[in-house]
Every structure is written in structure tokens, then in C-alpha cells.
Amino acid sequence: MTNGSTEVYLGLGSNQGDRNLYIEKALSMLDSTPGVRVEEKSSVIETEPWGFESENCFLNCAVRVNVDSTVSPESLLETCKEIETELGRNEFMEYREDGSRVYHSRNIDIDILLYGDRRISSERLTVPHPLMAERDFVMVPLRQIATDGIENAFPEIFRPALKTSAK
């Protein structure tokens, strides 16, 4: 992280169409966003869908980006949502009677996992991502690129035990 910038970690996933192409297009669009620079990408792993049934497995990866001080967490979230929409994602939110979210297949999904050492809780954004520690499809790639500083800032997330759902 350079002076005036924040180290941010994003999770990307796709289980429809040309999954690799959607991930690469999303990364290119992120990198061309003013104030956002993609620094490192994890390997891409293939995983079963989480929270719903689908014949299509996901490709998932994590990326570390540097975000300068002109980019707020909320504006980065908006950028991620705009990229998802441009790449064909339908942001229809469906919930079960118990209040839990119903998940669907998608061309691209971009989640803000960590935003520096900040903890954010707003109506639209929660950081650290609330379910990331439960999801190997997030944690396996994230561990590949996480710096010691970020691991030390969130010891509760970087637990030693992992389930094995990645292929």
C-alpha cells in the first residue's frame, strides 16, 4: 500500500457463460477505473455453488487492489455493481420466509471482502464481508494473496482450519 491509498480485497466469481472471460473483463474494467489499480490476482479455483443448486460450477478468485483516497468504500461498491450490470448480472434479490437470501447463477459477482483494516457496517455494505470466513471459495484464493498486515488486522477471519470444497 502506498501513501494515500488503501489495500482492498475483492472476491470474484462466475458460473455462467465463458466464466474466465467474465472474470478477466471485470478485472480489466476495475483496473481502468480512476483511483483503482489491480495489484495481484490469486489463482482461479473451481467450486460447487454455495447456497443453491446449479449444474454449473463457479470459477472464483480474489484480487488485491489499491484504491486511492478519492475512492470511498461506497463508491467502490457502486463501481462493482455497475461492472456486474454491464456484464449481464441481474441484481434481483429474493429472500426466503426465514429472511435468508436465495442465491442464483450469475455471469459475474464482485464482493468487497476487506477494505484496509476498516470495519464498515451500513445499509449497503458490510466489511469484512459477513460470510467470507465460512466460504472456502473466498478464503482459499484470499489466503494466496493476503499480506501479513491484513491477516493480523483480522485474525478471526484467517482461521487455520479450512473445509475442502475447492477442486
Residue ranges and their predicted role:
Residues 9, 13, 66, 103:
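Short, flexible active-site loop motifs that bind/organize anionic cofactors or intermediates
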Residues 50-58, 74-167:
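Flexible, gly/pro- and Lys/Arg-enriched active-site loops
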Residues 25, 29-71, 76-77:
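Short, surface-exposed acidic-centric catalytic microdomains
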Residues 18-20, 31-40, 112-115:
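Short, mixed-charge, low-aromatic patches
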Residues 2-27, 35:
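Extended accessory regions or peripheral subdomains of proteins
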Residues 14, 63-69, 114-116:
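Short beta-strand-to-loop capping motifs
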